[in-house]
């Protein structure tokens, strides 16, 4: 039975895609069968692995009932790593989920919409060791779905005071969903501090996050690394865990090891 890891932050630009991709690649390198599910309407993750992702069936078609989820799983160039792509039409799916969620809340009906992602994944749970969800920022309905589906939610946050407000909102919402549920939800959640530097401001921000959220913060932090524009490739831009000669590569390797302990892989 697959473990589900979800990367969420209600604020955009927090590093969800880079986090998702590097965790996925690291676990695949460790020999686990990994499925990366793109739930972001921008399809950034999809575009890195599938050239014509906009014209490729994926999560949108599964949710619309046009495709079976087993038929939209695509292999990648990396051993043990597969992907289900997204596209811009995912926005329509998100809006429909939000409408269902709102309707069920105001009518005080049993909220079935929160099980949407969990239900979609059920037919393939025995095909993979780990399923990783790379999420759209904005929609609370998807975050709620992830709380119901995931074993672990990773909340990436940049070194930025405004970003810290975003992670505070995300964590509070996750706690509200867990405490407000009639079920005993077994969903862990932890903050991942990214794009750290050696500056005093960066160190102070890391200390602030650790002092505020205590044990809800990963020990590992991810170093900021910007490759020169002429050297930037897919690997330097997203898959940094492969280069263990760099600080950021070692950071992602450490994160994967920490996550394995967290979800008992």
What function would you assign to each model-found segment?
Residues 1-265:
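P-loop NTP-binding core
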